[in-house]
């Protein structure tokens, strides 16, 4: 027997919108923001027992993917999902916990390289299985071809937002 299908609410019903959105774009944007918030809360709930924040998890994943050499701090900041001006302080806290280590670049003393430690790798390994539950949500909600289209649509929206910022000099 298949598990029950969760009740699907439109964003209009979910936020108890009493007036129609002025445009479909506005409705889609609110839906995207609500989905992003729900996703962040879901992931945060999975990470909380391990004492890891979303941003810390993101840094650990970036550094694990970088391999043994690690990455410059600024590169880590550029690759983060949720960009933060406080990446140095974030990495300070992670270094205190023993999850990452830093070293100055010998060629350019202004550059600082970050590398994930064994403790950080072990932490991530313990989180890999629970995080698969996040993927399972997408797999349950969408067919593979729908996921491909969603990825394409999101890429297009982000590209348009970047182009709009460039043309308008920011929002």
Where do the protein language model's features map onto the residues?
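C-terminal regulatory/oligomerization modules of transcriptional regulators
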Residues: 1-21, 145-171
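Alpha-helical hairpin
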Residues: 21, 52-54, 116, 142
């Amino acid at each position: 027997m298949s598990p029950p299908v969760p009740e699907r609410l439109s964003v209009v019903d979910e936020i108890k919108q009493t007036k129609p959105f002025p445009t479909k774009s506005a409705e889609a944007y609110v839906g995207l923001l609500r989905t992003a918030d729900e996703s962040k809360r879901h992931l945060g709930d999975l990470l909380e027992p391990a004492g890891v924040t979303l941003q810390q998890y993101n840094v650990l994943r970036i550094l694990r993917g970088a391999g043994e050499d690690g990455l410059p701090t600024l590169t880590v900041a550029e690759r983060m999902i949720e960009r933060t001006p406080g990446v140095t302080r974030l990495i300070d806290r992670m270094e205190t916990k023993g999850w990452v280590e830093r070293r100055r670049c010998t060629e350019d003393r202004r550059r600082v390289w970050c590398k994930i430690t064994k403790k950080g790798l072990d932490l991530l390994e313990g989180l890999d299985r629970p995080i698969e539950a996040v993927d399972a949500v997408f797999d349950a909600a969408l067919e593979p071809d729908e996921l491909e289209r969603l990825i394409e649509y999101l890429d297009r929206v982000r590209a348009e937002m970047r182009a709009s910022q460039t043309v308008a000099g920011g929002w």
